[in-house]
Curated annotation (Swiss-Prot):
Residues 110-119 are annotated as: 5 X 2 AA tandem repeats of [RM]-G. Core component of the spliceosomal U1, U2, U4 and U5 small nuclear ribonucleoproteins (snRNPs), the building blocks of the spliceosome. Most spliceosomal snRNPs contain a common set of Sm proteins, SNRPB, SNRPD1, SNRPD2, SNRPD3, SNRPE, SNRPF and SNRPG that assemble in a heptameric protein ring on the Sm site of the small nuclear RNA to form the core snRNP. Component of the U1 snRNP. The U1 snRNP is composed of the U1 snRNA and the 7 core Sm proteins SNRPB, SNRPD1, SNRPD2, SNRPD3, SNRPE, SNRPF and SNRPG, and at least three U1 snRNP-specific proteins SNRNP70/U1-70K, SNRPA/U1-A and SNRPC/U1-C. GO terms for molecular function: enzyme binding; histone pre-mRNA DCP binding; RNA binding; telomerase RNA binding; U7 snRNA binding. PANTHER family: SMALL NUCLEAR RIBONUCLEOPROTEIN SM. Belongs to the snRNP core protein family. The keyword Ribosomal protein does not apply. Keywords: Acetylation, Cytoplasm, Methylation, mRNA processing, mRNA splicing, Nucleus, Repeat, Ribonucleoprotein, RNA-binding, Spliceosome. The gene is SNRPD3. Plays a role in pre-mRNA splicing as a core component of the spliceosomal U1, U2, U4 and U5 small nuclear ribonucleoproteins (snRNPs), the building blocks of the spliceosome. Component of both the pre-catalytic spliceosome B complex and activated spliceosome C complexes. As a component of the minor spliceosome, involved in the splicing of U12-type introns in pre-mRNAs. As part of the U7 snRNP it is involved in histone pre-mRNA 3'-end processing. This is Small nuclear ribonucleoprotein Sm D3. It comes from Homo sapiens (Human). Gene3D superfamilies: 2.30.30.100. Sequence repeats lie at residues 110-111, 112-113, 114-115, 116-117, 118-119. It is found in: Cytoplasm, Cytosol; Nucleus. The modification N-acetylserine is found at S2.
């Protein structure tokens, strides 16, 4: 099983300044050293803001992925190549021209599998 696009973008953020909020409401801002596929994050040079508003400086921190509420990544990652490929995939699904497009639409509308309807309900049973 391959990793999804959001995790790929998270890996792209390694080495950049990110903000991470945990489920307990603490906010960590610092350099993302490493991110794992399960969203475990190792960060350095951290400014942590606790729920009561206190601010502290930490040298290193390791946050378990299941305890992360959300991450704020740098805006420069909007141009990441994996996001470009997602845009291109959606681009080709517009209306085509000619008979081929009509046939494609008919095939797509038919569906798959057994769901062929009830048939003739007035048919004599055997």
């Amino acid at each position: 099983m391959s990793i999804g696009v959001p995790i790929k973008v998270l890996h792209e953020a390694e080495g950049h300044i990110v903000t991470c909020e945990t489920n307990t409401g603490e906010v960590y801002r610092g350099k993302l050293i490493e991110a794992e596929d399960n969203m475990n994050c190792q960060m350095s040079n951290i400014t942590v803001t606790y729920r009561d508003g206190r601010v502290a400086q930490l040298e290193q921190v390791y946050i378990r992925g299941s305890k992360i509420r959300f991450l704020i990544l740098p805006d420069m990652l909007k141009n990441a190549p994996m996001l470009k490929s997602m845009k291109n995939k959606n681009q080709g699904s517009g209306a085509g021209r000619g008979k081929a497009a009509i046939l494609k639409a008919q095939v797509a509308a038919r569906g798959r599998g057994r769901g062929m309807g009830r048939g003739n309900i007035f048919q004599k049973r055997r």
